């Protein structure tokens, strides 16, 4: 996965939506930080390790803001829907908003570390009316409650020696 979140197989960019959906739906992260895809075909199981992940492998296509509940529901491009409070969202470089897909939110829960998920511009635009910046921090104002976003750079590194 390159810096722009595009998936590659050697020198060929993967563009088939069905294949990308399958990979993203079965993407996990090991304790050492390496990303892997787990495939099950009947009673056969196969694990494929990604050589390099340099950017966000999964994206939130839409954000549904529920101010009365104080949450944002994120619709991911792998079919999952995550519910987040502002504190569970992070702001990285260039005011990029992202969150962690936790192993417990994946089914089956095979991973041991979270997978970073970036909000696409369409999802970000849904947050615009609720986002505030005070010169130091970004916050979501949901139902009169100010929820400060974490300031954190996403980690794509792996440590096989761990």
Model-derived features: positions:
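Long, non-globular segments of proteins
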Residues: 1-162
């Amino acid at each position: 996965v390159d810096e722009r979140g595009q998936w590659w197989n050697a020198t060929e960019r993967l563009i088939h939506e069905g294949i990308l959906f399958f990979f993203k739906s079965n993407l996990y992260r090991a304790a050492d930080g390496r990303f892997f895809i787990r495939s099950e075909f009947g009673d056969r199981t196969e694990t494929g390790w990604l050589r390099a992940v340099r950017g966000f492998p999964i994206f939130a296509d839409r954000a549904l803001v529920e101010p009365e509940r104080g949450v944002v529901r994120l619709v991911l491009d792998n079919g999952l829907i995550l519910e987040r409070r502002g504190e569970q969202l992070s702001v990285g470089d260039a005011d990029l908003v992202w969150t962690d897909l936790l192993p417990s939110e994946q089914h089956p829960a095979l991973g041991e570390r979270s997978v970073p998920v970036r909000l696409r511009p369409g999802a970000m635009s849904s947050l615009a009316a609720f986002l505030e910046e005070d010169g130091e921090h970004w916050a979501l104002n949901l139902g009169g409650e100010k929820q400060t976003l974490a300031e954190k750079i996403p980690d794509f590194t792996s440590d096989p020696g761990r």
